[in-house]
Amino acid sequence: MYRSHVTANGLEVAQKWARMSPLPETATGLHVETRGGPFTREFTIRFNAPPDDLDSWLNSSPGTSNLKPVVNGRSRVYNVEPGNGAMHAEVTVDDDTNLVVIHTYWS
């Protein structure tokens, strides 16, 4: 019970801080990593989804909808303007594996 609460809470906070819409319904392999203590908090979210669903999700999310990604080989990096008091938010998409990584933190 505690682990599922931490996962759900971390996902919710990371989505708010990165200003991202709910994950695509087709998302698989969800992994939520939480770090920090009372004065810092960091979240890293990983999941996979089909390419068309990822593009739709990125285009419908306030954090990425108007951004041009930095392309690095087969990866796209979106440097998102963080929300809800966060200091950093970034979304990376690996186009070879369809892996998405949302990384955000507050300090």
Name each model-derived stretch.
Residues 17, 35-37, 81, 92:
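Generic marker of residues within folded, mature protein domains
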Residues 1-35:
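N-terminal leader/targeting segments
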Residues 7, 47, 95-96:
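Alpha-helical interaction segments
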Residues 55-107:
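Extracytosolic low-complexity repeat regions of secreted or lipid-anchored proteins
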Residues 21-74:
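Mature extracytoplasmic domains of secretory-pathway proteins
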